[in-house]
A protein has these predicted regions:
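Hydrophobic transmembrane alpha-helices and their immediate junctions
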Residues: 185, 322-360, 386-388
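A membrane-periplasm/extracellular boundary helix in multi-pass inner-membrane enzymes
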Residues: 138, 222-271, 291-295, 410
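Transmembrane alpha-helices of multi-pass inner-membrane enzymes
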Residues: 24, 53, 351-360, 365-411
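Aromatic-anchored transmembrane helix interface
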Residues: 41-51, 70-82, 90-114, 124, ...
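Membrane-interfacial helix-loop-helix modules of multi-pass inner-membrane proteins that assemble, modify
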Residues: 32-37, 81-94, 127, 131-167, ...
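Long extracytoplasmic/lumenal interhelical loops at the membrane interface
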Residues: 150, 157-158, 270-323
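N-terminal signal-anchor transmembrane segment
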Residues: 1-62, 75-88, 139, 356, ...
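Alpha-helical transmembrane segments of multi-pass inner-membrane proteins
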Residues: 122-149, 161-222, 341
Length: 411
């Protein structure tokens, strides 16, 4: 077996650690959050363009081979960009910004595809997921300690994402990537320990429930082979959970005043009160968006109306509102496609697909963020491991005199 050359080791190291770290920073919205908080002077668009350029260039020197399944995943983002930038069926003062945001996401999507088309794509995607989790939970802890302010909702911590509803989604998706790519149960449990405070500090109701289901299923299905380790983890985790609960409880107090919003959220999570787990405001927003979508059910009102005028907090209703029945069928069809493939391959990427689908009834706009693209492309690469390499080769000119001599000789 040939030993890798110094150049091979260098380009693979840059791919895994530099490009993977950049994708993790993009997934965690580290550039946007740090810039808006006044920590970093680098504008997010400059970081995005630099990351895309570096990832594509480094991928090209690592001999990429494309997973054709990612083209199916790219269909919905491409349709939404075409609808927003070219058709412009929904016209508003924010439409240019919406089109620019979708274009930015398509560039990030291409960069992720390029990186995950290389031979070391599994290590790179794994490091991207780990770094995104560390950045997200770390920024939330810094915010809790009063070192910096990111959140847009007082009383709930958000980290770089700025809105506390996004960190639980990101952390569960990144855990899904880790479960799909890493077979090391102890390392995966360590990453669960990283995710728990990141979700808890947001006081997110759906986030805590989905994290508990995801991690609970993973631990139970692997408990038999790791019983001794789990027993040790339980002994350590119980007092830590007690401390965590006390910290969360103290977070509902602001001096002598009690934050009713966070207190009610915490009570609903502790008691599994499904009536309190529901949000009356979200139910009203969903009904308003549903009524608007019903006015143009076939083709929708155009990309951009969801998130600017209406906030259905439901990805299916959001896409129905924007793209009509074709968009809804395309979105639901993508999930059916991934689920079918996962079942046929013995449950490959099952945790990741669950993490992706679980939040679709509880939020909107996830298809416009880097961590969703990273998770979707990773799922496609895991489920369809076959790769195709496109090369440009020139056919060598045939020596006519040589051919003529052969023909004469045969005659």
């Amino acid at each position: 077996m040939l030993r890798p050359t110094g150049w091979t080791r260098l380009r693979e190291w840059v791919l895994v650690w530099v490009c993977g770290g950049m994708l993790g920073a993009l997934a965690a919205d580290a550039a946007i959050g740090s810039y808006e908080a006044g920590i970093s002077p680098i504008k997010p668009i400059l970081f995005t363009l630099a990351a895309v350029f570096v990832c594509i260039c480094v991928s090209l020197v690592n001999k990429p081979r494309l997973c054709l399944a990612v083209l199916g995943v790219a269909l919905l983002p491409a349709v939404r960009l075409f609808d927003a930038a070219v058709l412009r069926r929904f016209d508003s003062s924010y439409q240019d910004q919406i089109a620019m945001d979708l274009m930015r996401m398509l560039l990030v999507f291409i960069a992720i595809v390029a990186v995950l088309s290389t031979e070391k794509w599994q290590k790179t995607a794994l490091w991207a997921a780990v770094s995104a989790m560390l950045l997200t939970t770390g920024s939330e802890i810094c915010e809790m300690l009063g070192m910096v302010k990111f959140t847009s909702i007082p009383g709930r911590f958000a980290g770089f994402n700025s809105h506390p509803n996004f960190p639980p989604v990101l952390l569960c998706e990144m855990l899904g990537i880790i479960f799909a790519l890493s077979k090391n149960f102890r390392f995966n449990c360590l990453m669960i320990a990283v995710a728990v405070p990141g979700v808890a500090l947001t006081y997110g109701r759906s986030g805590m429930v989905i994290l508990a289901l995801l991690c609970g299923a993973y631990v139970l299905l692997n408990a038999r082979r790791n019983f001794g380790f789990l027993l040790l983890v339980t002994i350590i985790a119980v007092p830590l959970l007690g401390i965590g609960v006390a910290v969360l409880q103290s977070g509902t107090q602001q001096g002598v005043m009690k934050d009713k919003n966070t207190a009610d959220r915490l009570e609903a999570i502790y008691n599994l009160d499904f009536d309190k787990l529901k949000s009356p405001e979200r139910v009203k927003d969903l009904n308003d968006a549903w009524e608007m979508a019903a006015k143009k059910p076939l083709l929708g009102h155009g990309t951009g109306i969801s998130g600017t005028i209406f906030a259905p907090h439901n990805e299916y209703v959001s896409l129905w509102l924007e793209l009509g029945i074709p968009g809804l069928v395309l979105f639901a069809g993508t999930w059916l496609w991934l689920i079918t493939r996962s079942v046929l391959t013995g449950g490959q990427a099952g945790y990741l697909i669950f993490a992706l689908i679980a939040y679709t009834p509880f939020g909107q706009g996830r298809i416009e963020v880097p961590h969703f693209s990273l998770a979707m492309i990773t799922a496609a690469c895991v489920l369809w491991p076959k790769r195709y390499q496109f090369t440009l080769r020139s056919l060598q000119a045939v020596d006519r005199s040589h051919v003529h001599q052969n023909v004469v000789g045969q005659a």
